[in-house]
A protein has these predicted regions:
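Conserved non-catalytic scaffold segment of RNase H-like nuclease domains
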Residues: 2-127, 142-153
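Short, flexible loop segments at boundaries between secondary-structure elements
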Residues: 129-139
Length: 153
């Protein structure tokens, strides 16, 4: 008889949408997160403890980004700012394994937003484990399309 593990694994599957990104230099510099969506999974089961928020970026959404996510400037006018939800968001993700497709993009934006608060908040990977599902997919399916759409098909 084998012993069953009693370790609790808490994962947060997370995605962000942004006002855009830079092609040169830091991809996040001067841009903002406008949506955070996160789903909690404990021991491989959905808990229903999700985190979702739209954010007012105090800048316009680039047309290219709007073409990707369809989130309009007008829709965001009455939403909270990142600063207003930062503590709740940090409490939600703290200690979890974050599972993010193309994690460098989202983590770059998250760390940038935290840095703008001027509160000496450490990098996300110091209080969360980060797993990049794109990197995992590339290892599992080398040479294949690894977009979320392709992986879900």
């Amino acid at each position: 008889m084998t012993a069953m593990s009693t370790a609790i694994t808490r994962q947060i599957v997370l995605d962000t949408e942004t006002t855009g990104m830079n092609q040169i230099g830091a991809h996040y510099e001067g841009h903002k997160i406008i949506e955070i969506g996160a789903v909690e999974v404990v021991n491989r089961r959905l808990t229903g403890n999700n985190f979702h928020v739209y954010l007012k970026p105090d800048r316009l959404v680039d047309p290219e980004a709007f073409g990707v996510h369809g989130i309009a400037d007008e829709f965001l006018l009455d939403k909270p700012t990142f600063a207003e939800v930062a503590d709740e968001f940090m409490d939600y993700i703290r200690g979890a394994e974050l599972v993010i497709h193309n994690a460098a993009f989202d983590i770059g934006f998250m760390d940038y937003e935290f840095s703008l608060l001027k509160r000496d908040i450490p990098k996300t990977n110091t209080f969360c484990k980060v797993t990049d599902s794109l990197a995992v997919a590339r290892k599992m399916f080398p040479g294949k399309r690894n977009s979320l759409d392709a992986l879900c098909a």
